[in-house]
């Protein structure tokens, strides 16, 4: 099993639409660890770790987000897996 880490920044109408909580729910269902947070510039940022296939699924999900979201871009930086997370949290 190949492990992966993705640092993502999601742009568009992504705050105030339950993007963070829905991403957490998706991550937990996929067995992906990490965090997600709102940024002051209106984007949402996250770090996802786990099985490469599951991390890729979560990144693809970010392109749609929850029903009220209007995603315009998902920036992804693939990084080395660290295994530093034990769960998935909404960071503040």
Swiss-Prot record:
A molecular function (GO) term: acylphosphatase activity
Keywords tagged on the record: Hydrolase
InterPro entries according to UniProt: Acylphosphatase, Acylphosphatase-like_dom, Acylphosphatase-like_dom_sf, Acylphosphatase_CS
Family matches, as SUPFAM superfamilies: Acylphosphatase/BLUF domain-like (SSF54975)
Active site: 20, 38
Disulphide-bridged cysteine pairs: none
Enzyme Commission (EC) number: 3.6.1.7
Top-level taxon in the UniProt lineage: Bacteria
Domain Acylphosphatase-like: residue ranges: 5-92
Catalysed reactions, semicolon-separated: an acyl phosphate + H2O = a carboxylate + phosphate + H(+)
Matching PROSITE patterns: ACYLPHOSPHATASE_1 (PS00150), ACYLPHOSPHATASE_3 (PS51160)
Similarity comment: family membership: Belongs to the acylphosphatase family.
Protein's name according to its UniProt entry: Acylphosphatase
Name of the coding gene: acyP
């Amino acid at each position: 099993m190949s492990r992966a880490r993705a640092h993502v920044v999601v742009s568009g109408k992504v705050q105030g639409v339950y993007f963070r909580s829905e991403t957490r729910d998706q991550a937990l269902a996929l067995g992906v660890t990490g965090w997600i947070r709102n940024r002051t510039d209106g984007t949402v940022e996250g770090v996802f770790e786990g099985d490469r296939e599951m991390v890729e699924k979560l990144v693809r999900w970010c392109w749609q987000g929850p029903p009220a979201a209007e995603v315009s871009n998902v920036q992804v930086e693939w990084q080395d897996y660290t295994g530093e997370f034990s769960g998935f949290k909404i960071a503040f």
